Amino acid sequence: MSETGRGPCTVPVWYRYTPGDGVRITVGPGSRKVRLLRAAGRASLCVQVETLPYKYVSVEGHIEVVETAVADDQREMARRYLGEKLGARYLTANAATLAEEILVVLHPERWWSVDFSQVRW
């Protein structure tokens, strides 16, 4: 996602992936990120494991913007990235902001991956 004269918008995001349900992220309603996503109608995401053995997966596809974020998604992402206790505290402390967030679903069309534990040198 990019604007004229600028590089692509690349920022870390929390995500939730369930096969058949797409890659789900939540974004602020007035953010540059959601504005660019709406304009492009497509997105890509790359995630990696930096510890050995190095692995990554990249996915590209069309997006669906859902006007209200799903609390289950926010809860699962908070637990995944912050753990049970800190995730619960984050959700409570940010309840008003989270209630305004928008859900974006990336529907995978192309995948690329590397798993160096599977590479035979």
Residue ranges, per PLM feature:
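Generic marker of residues within folded, mature protein domains
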Residues: 5, 51-53, 96
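Short, solvent-exposed aromatic-acidic interface loops
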Residues: 28-32, 81
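Generic internal hydrophobic packing segments that stabilize the cores of diverse globular domains
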Residues: 34, 40, 71-75
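Short secondary-structure boundary/capping segments
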Residues: 15, 35, 94-96
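Short beta-strand segments
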Residues: 1-29, 37, 43-47, 56-58
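Short, surface-exposed beta-strand-loop junctions and turns on beta-sheet-rich folds
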Residues: 31-33, 52, 120-121
